[in-house]
Amino acid sequence: MDPVDPNLEPWNHPGSQPRTPCNKCYCKKCCYHCQMCFITKGLGISYGRKKRRQRRRPPQGNQAHQDPLPEQPSSQHRGDHPTGPKE
């Protein structure tokens, strides 16, 4: 291993910075480009602001979705399992 100049900061040591700039590609090679690419692309960790997802609202003029449901009988027997007492 080559000796490193002790006067250099650790982020300026030779080999500490990649030769090419980071890009937005998510291929395997670019995910391992540098530590920052690995954390953001490979692991998917991002400490930026979260974007608020807007809810989809129905149009204001459309009242078709506000129609009341028709009354239905409360007791309906279905299948072979009656809910009443056995005779």
From Swiss-Prot:
Known partners and oligomeric status: Interacts with host CCNT1. Associates with the P-TEFb complex composed at least of Tat, P-TEFb (CDK9 and CCNT1), TAR RNA, RNA Pol II. Recruits the HATs CREBBP, TAF1/TFIID, EP300, PCAF and GCN5L2. Interacts with host KAT5/Tip60; this interaction targets the latter to degradation. Interacts with the host deacetylase SIRT1. Interacts with host capping enzyme RNGTT; this interaction stimulates RNGTT. Binds to host KDR, and to the host integrins ITGAV/ITGB3 and ITGA5/ITGB1. Interacts with host KPNB1/importin beta-1 without previous binding to KPNA1/importin alpha-1. Interacts with EIF2AK2.
Cellular component terms per the entry's GO annotation: extracellular region; host cell cytoplasm; host cell nucleolus
Keyword Transcription belongs to the record: yes
Residues recorded with modification N6-acetyllysine: 28, 50-51
Binding-site list for Zn(2+) 1: 22, 33-34, 37
Positions bearing the site annotation: Essential for Tat translocation through the endosomal membrane: 11
One of the GO BP terms on file: DNA-templated transcription
Record flagged with keyword Zinc: yes
Source taxonomy: Viruses, Riboviria, Pararnavirae, Artverviricota, Revtraviricetes
PTM annotation: Asymmetrical arginine methylation by host PRMT6 seems to diminish the transactivation capacity of Tat and affects the interaction with host CCNT1. Acetylation by EP300, CREBBP, GCN5L2/GCN5 and PCAF regulates the transactivation activity of Tat. EP300-mediated acetylation of Lys-50 promotes dissociation of Tat from the TAR RNA through the competitive binding to PCAF's bromodomain. In addition, the non-acetylated Tat's N-terminus can also interact with PCAF. PCAF-mediated acetylation of Lys-28 enhances Tat's binding to CCNT1. Lys-50 is deacetylated by SIRT1.
Organism expressing this protein natively: Human immunodeficiency virus type 1 group M subtype A (isolate MAL) (HIV-1)
Binding-site positions, Zn(2+) 2: 25, 27, 30
Subcellular location: Host nucleus, Host nucleolus; Host cytoplasm; Secreted
Keywords: Acetylation, Activator, AIDS, Apoptosis, Host cytoplasm, Host nucleus, Host-virus interaction, Inhibition of host innate immune response by virus, Inhibition of host interferon signaling pathway by virus, Interferon antiviral system evasion, Isopeptide bond, Metal-binding, Methylation, Modulation of host chromatin by virus, Modulation of host PP1 activity by virus, Phosphoprotein, RNA-binding, Secreted, Transcription, Transcription regulation, Ubl conjugation, Viral immunoevasion, Zinc
Miscellaneous comment in the UniProt entry for this protein: This truncated variant has a premature stop codon. It may have arose as a consequence of tissue culture passaging.
Domain comment as written in the entry: The cell attachment site mediates the interaction with ITGAV/ITGB3 and ITGA5/ITGB1 integrins, leading to vascular cell migration and invasion. This interaction also provides endothelial cells with the adhesion signal they require to grow in response to mitogens.
Motif Cell attachment site positions after renumbering to this chain: 78-80
Protein name: Protein Tat
A Pfam family recorded for this sequence: Tat
Positions with biased composition (Basic and acidic residues): 77-87
Annotated spans, Interaction with human CREBBP: 1-24
Region: Transactivation, residue numbers: 1-48
Family as reported in the entry's similarity comment: Belongs to the lentiviruses Tat family.
Extent of motif Nuclear localization signal, RNA-binding (TAR), and protein transduction: 49-57
